[in-house]
Every structure is written in structure tokens, then in C-alpha cells.
Curated annotation (Swiss-Prot):
Subunit relationships: Fourteen ClpP subunits assemble into 2 heptameric rings which stack back to back to give a disk-like structure with a central cavity, resembling the structure of eukaryotic proteasomes.
Pfam short name (any one): CLP_protease
GO biological process entries: protein quality control for misfolded or incompletely synthesized proteins
Organism in which the protein naturally occurs: Anaeromyxobacter sp. (strain Fw109-5)
PROSITE patterns linked: CLP_PROTEASE_HIS (PS00382), CLP_PROTEASE_SER (PS00381)
GO cellular component: cytoplasm; endopeptidase Clp complex
Upper classification of the organism: Bacteria, Pseudomonadati, Myxococcota, Myxococcia, Myxococcales
Coiled coil region boundaries: none
Active site: 100, 125
Homology family: Belongs to the peptidase S14 family.
Protein name: ATP-dependent Clp protease proteolytic subunit
Length: 204
């Protein structure tokens, strides 16, 4: 993979200049960016940011921007569970694509606060896995992936309000949607051209 220089932002403070990498600067505005395949390392960083932002202000929304092809189911579920665990509502915004676990996280945002831009692409499907080893080990792994498949389908049905039978049918193969189709499906709430207005603190 070619090296991509990290952009830095310089700000003036009463103590002089201070520089931030672009992601740290976005974090100051309660923006978390998920722009890579999802693995344990990526999940740990996203989870740490969500927990930090909750400790900073438990009553102010967090924005999770997603441009991801998906990745590890367990890593994605760790992020999803943290989104539900933290007190701030987590708004999700899809730029580019949200596929596989990326789409799952997009759908798992706070109700009414799940967005995609007009040219975004969303794809859902069943979890994939390849196994080697003794027949009994392969059988154990196959049963586990079927358990995860059922769990993911149940959660998607809850967030989209689609019948479980439709979720099971649609995720049997890669199911691609544009932003408008994703709204009709219930994966997002709105297609947006401009950034949503900043969310104020919840009323006490």
C-alpha cells in the first residue's frame, strides 16, 4: 500500500501554536472516522474514541463517519456494542461505501440519526468464513458462523424494521443498494446533501 502522508492542522492557542493530525482534530468536534477495513486494531481505536468522547460529555452526540468495505464480524460487533453502550447517541453517516459490517454499523446508529450522501453505496450479506482442519473442527466453526449469521440478521431486522424472513433472504447473497434504496429499506433515515445541523446537548 502506498504511503499517504497524514495531514496536520495548526491552531493558535494562548500558549502558541499547536498541531494535530487531522483525525485528532476531528475528534475535538466529536467526529470519529471509520475509513478502513474493520479488524481488531481498528475496532480498538474506534471503541477507545467512543469511550473517550462519552467521558468528555455524556450528553452530546457523537458522529461516526463510515467509508468501509467491512471486515471482521467480531470486531464489528465490538464497535456496535460500544455504540449501544455509551450514553451519547451515535449518529452514523455513510460516505463512499458501507459494506458488510460497515453497513451493519451504519444501521446501528441512533434512530433518526442515520444518514448517507446521495452517491453512497451500501451492501449487506451473510458472514463469510473458510475453515481447515479436522472434520469435527470444521463442524464446530460452521455452527459458530451460523450462530453469528442468525445474530446479525436479528439485529438488522430490529434496526431496519424489516421482517426477519426478508433479511435472511436478502443477506443470502451480496445485496447492493444506493442511498435512496437504503432509506426505503430502513438502513438509514435520510439521504443528505449537506452536513446535518450540530446536535445540542440533551435537555436536563
Amino acid at each position: 500500500m502506498p504511503y499517504i502522508p497524514m495531514p496536520y492542522v495548526v491552531e493558535q492557542t494562548h500558549r502558541g501554536e499547536r498541531s494535530y493530525d487531522i483525525y485528532s482534530r476531528l475528534l475535538k468536534d466529536r467526529i470519529v472516522f471509520l475509513g478502513t477495513p474493520i479488524d481488531d486494531d481498528v475496532a480498538n481505536v474506534v471503541i477507545a474514541q467512543l469511550l473517550f468522547l462519552e467521558s468528555e460529555d455524556p450528553d452530546k452526540d457523537i458522529s461516526l463517519y463510515i467509508n468501509s468495505p467491512g471486515g471482521s464480524v467480531t470486531s464489528g460487533l465490538a464497535i456496535y456494542d460500544t455504540m449501544q453502550y455509551v450514553k451519547p447517541q451515535v449518529s452514523t453517516i455513510c460516505l463512499g461505501q458501507a459494506a458488510s459490517m460497515g453497513a451493519f454499523l451504519l444501521a446501528g446508529g441512533a434512530a433518526g440519526k442515520r444518514f448517507a450522501v446521495p452517491n453512497a453505496r451500501i451492501m449487506i450479506h451473510q458472514p463469510m468464513g473458510g475453515f481447515q482442519g479436522q472434520a469435527t473442527d470444521i463442524d464446530i466453526q460452521a455452527r459458530e458462523i451460523l450462530r453469528l449469521k442468525a445474530k446479525l440478521n436479528d439485529i438488522l431486522a430490529k434496526h431496519t424494521k424489516q421482517p426477519l424472513e426478508r433479511i435472511e433472504k436478502d443477506t443470502d447473497r451480496d445485496y447492493f443498494m444506493g442511498a435512496g434504496e437504503a432509506k426505503e429499506y430502513g438502513l438509514i433515515d435520510e439521504v443528505i446533501v449537506h452536513k446535518p445541523k450540530a446536535t445540542e446537548k440533551k435537555a436536563q
